[in-house]
Amino acid sequence: MLVKIHIRRRFKEGHAKQIQALLREFRAGAMNREGYISGETLISLEDPQELLVIGTWESMDAWERWRENEARKRFEAMLEIYQDGPTQYEAFALGALTINDTD
Protein backbone atom coordinates (compact mmCIF):
# COMPACT_ATOMS: atom_id res chain seq x y z
CA MET A 1 0.00 0.00 0.00
CA LEU A 2 1.41 3.38 -1.01
CA VAL A 3 1.94 5.85 1.81
CA LYS A 4 2.49 9.61 1.93
CA ILE A 5 4.68 10.83 4.75
CA HIS A 6 4.31 14.46 5.83
CA ILE A 7 7.40 15.85 7.53
CA ARG A 8 6.94 19.32 8.97
CA ARG A 9 9.85 21.44 10.15
CA ARG A 10 10.16 25.06 11.24
CA PHE A 11 13.57 26.65 10.84
CA LYS A 12 15.28 29.58 12.51
CA GLU A 13 15.84 32.60 10.28
CA GLY A 14 19.15 33.34 8.62
CA HIS A 15 20.39 29.91 7.51
CA ALA A 16 18.68 29.38 4.15
CA LYS A 17 21.79 28.28 2.21
CA GLN A 18 22.83 25.70 4.79
CA ILE A 19 19.28 24.36 5.12
CA GLN A 20 18.78 24.10 1.35
CA ALA A 21 22.08 22.23 0.93
CA LEU A 22 21.18 19.77 3.70
CA LEU A 23 17.69 19.20 2.29
CA ARG A 24 19.16 18.43 -1.15
CA GLU A 25 21.54 15.87 0.38
CA PHE A 26 18.70 14.44 2.46
CA ARG A 27 16.52 14.00 -0.65
CA ALA A 28 19.39 12.40 -2.59
CA GLY A 29 19.83 9.88 0.21
CA ALA A 30 16.13 8.99 0.19
CA MET A 31 16.04 8.64 -3.60
CA ASN A 32 18.52 5.76 -3.43
CA ARG A 33 16.43 3.78 -0.94
CA GLU A 34 14.30 0.81 -1.84
CA GLY A 35 10.64 1.78 -1.79
CA TYR A 36 11.11 5.51 -2.37
CA ILE A 37 8.81 6.85 -5.09
CA SER A 38 8.89 10.64 -4.94
CA GLY A 39 9.15 13.68 -2.74
CA GLU A 40 8.33 17.35 -2.78
CA THR A 41 9.14 20.25 -0.50
CA LEU A 42 6.55 22.95 0.16
CA ILE A 43 7.08 26.31 1.86
CA SER A 44 4.25 27.78 3.93
CA LEU A 45 2.80 30.98 2.49
CA GLU A 46 1.85 32.08 5.99
CA ASP A 47 5.25 31.31 7.57
CA PRO A 48 8.21 31.03 5.15
CA GLN A 49 10.30 29.42 7.90
CA GLU A 50 7.98 26.38 7.86
CA LEU A 51 8.57 23.58 5.38
CA LEU A 52 6.48 20.54 4.60
CA VAL A 53 8.17 17.61 2.89
CA ILE A 54 5.78 15.08 1.36
CA GLY A 55 7.41 11.76 0.58
CA THR A 56 5.70 8.92 -1.25
CA TRP A 57 6.82 5.39 -0.38
CA GLU A 58 5.78 1.96 -1.63
CA SER A 59 4.92 0.87 1.92
CA MET A 60 5.09 1.90 5.54
CA ASP A 61 7.85 -0.67 6.02
CA ALA A 62 9.97 1.01 3.32
CA TRP A 63 9.52 4.40 5.00
CA GLU A 64 10.31 3.01 8.45
CA ARG A 65 13.52 1.40 7.16
CA TRP A 66 14.63 4.79 5.83
CA ARG A 67 13.52 6.60 8.99
CA GLU A 68 15.68 4.25 11.10
CA ASN A 69 18.66 4.40 8.71
CA GLU A 70 21.86 5.70 10.35
CA ALA A 71 22.67 8.05 7.45
CA ARG A 72 19.19 9.58 7.73
CA LYS A 73 19.61 10.03 11.46
CA ARG A 74 22.84 11.97 10.82
CA PHE A 75 21.06 14.25 8.32
CA GLU A 76 18.24 14.76 10.81
CA ALA A 77 20.72 15.73 13.55
CA MET A 78 22.36 18.29 11.22
CA LEU A 79 18.98 19.82 10.34
CA GLU A 80 17.93 20.02 13.99
CA ILE A 81 20.70 22.57 14.59
CA TYR A 82 18.75 25.02 12.41
CA GLN A 83 15.25 24.06 13.55
CA ASP A 84 12.93 26.01 15.79
CA GLY A 85 11.25 23.02 17.46
CA PRO A 86 11.01 19.30 16.77
CA THR A 87 10.26 17.62 13.46
CA GLN A 88 6.63 16.47 13.16
CA TYR A 89 5.65 13.37 11.20
CA GLU A 90 2.30 12.15 9.86
CA ALA A 91 1.66 9.09 7.69
CA PHE A 92 -1.26 8.69 5.29
CA ALA A 93 -2.35 5.70 3.21
CA LEU A 94 -3.00 6.39 -0.46
CA GLY A 95 -6.28 5.26 -1.96
CA ALA A 96 -9.81 4.61 -0.83
CA LEU A 97 -10.18 3.22 2.66
CA THR A 98 -13.16 2.23 4.69
CA ILE A 99 -13.72 4.70 7.48
CA ASN A 100 -15.24 3.18 10.58
CA ASP A 101 -18.65 4.62 11.28
CA THR A 102 -19.73 4.64 14.90
CA ASP A 103 -23.42 5.27 14.14
Model-predicted segments: where are they?
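Residues in and immediately flanking transmembrane alpha helices
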Residues: 21, 51, 71-72
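Short, well-ordered beta-strand segments in beta-rich or mixed alpha/beta enzyme
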Residues: 2-9, 40-67
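An amphipathic, aromatic/His-enriched active-site/gating alpha helix that lines ligand/cofactor pockets
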Residues: 25-38, 56-90
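Short, structured interface segments that constitute the first stable element of a domain
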Residues: 5-7, 16, 25
